A protein has these predicted regions:
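Active-site glycine/GP-rich loop and adjacent strand/helix microenvironment
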Residues: 48-50, 54-55, 72-77, 86-91, ...
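Short, flexible coil/turn micro-motifs enriched in small/turn-prone residues
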Residues: 36-37, 60, 79-82, 102, ...
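Conserved ATP-binding/catalytic segment of the ANL
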Residues: 89, 96, 103-154
């Protein structure tokens, strides 16, 4: 039985580009050939998969939110996408990381804005536990924030 295995691949930029284009096309074809972008939310995208999709040029869009924020706090379109980030805060919202150094030290991500719930139905105690006196909704999730405004959930 003979097996032909690759022993050496000369990785010239032209070859690398063509291989990536071929892989990207195969992925897009698997989605019917008409996919514009892959939208991810509800749970983090596996880091290895995210890096792979990014490396072959598959357009990825990431969003982060909660039921209480109906539904988004952050969102990034593929043209402003940064690997590992769930994007900057969406319009009509404010968000920040409660940390002495939000860029380097994770802290709780809090948000306020038009789409934050008014409170839990008939449960003031639960509402007070998550929305402070300044109207910030406490997500309970840890994050960092880059100078660009992109958030990174930890």
């Amino acid at each position: 039985m003979q097996t032909n295995r690759m022993k050496l691949l000369m990785n010239m930029p032209v070859i690398s580009k063509k291989i990536k284009q071929h892989i990207r096309q195969r992925i897009m074809d698997a989605f019917g050939g008409n996919a514009y972008e892959i939208i991810v939310g509800g749970a983090p995208l596996n880091q290895g998969i995210e890096e792979f999709l990014n490396s072959v040029g598959v357009p990825v869009t990431i969003g982060y939110g909660t039921t209480e924020t109906a539904p988004l706090i952050t969102f990034v379109n593929y043209d402003n996408y940064k690997v590992g980030s769930c994007g900057p805060v969406v319009a009509h919202m404010e968000a920040k990381v409660l940390s002495p150094d939000p860029e380097h030290i994770p802290g709780e991500l809090v948000a306020r804005g038009l789409n934050v719930m008014l409170g839990y139905y008939k449960n003031e105690e639960a509402t007070r536990a998550v929305i402070d006196e300044d109207g910030w909704f406490h997500t309970g999730d840890l994050a960092t924030m880059a100078p660009s405004g992109h958030f990174y959930i930890k």
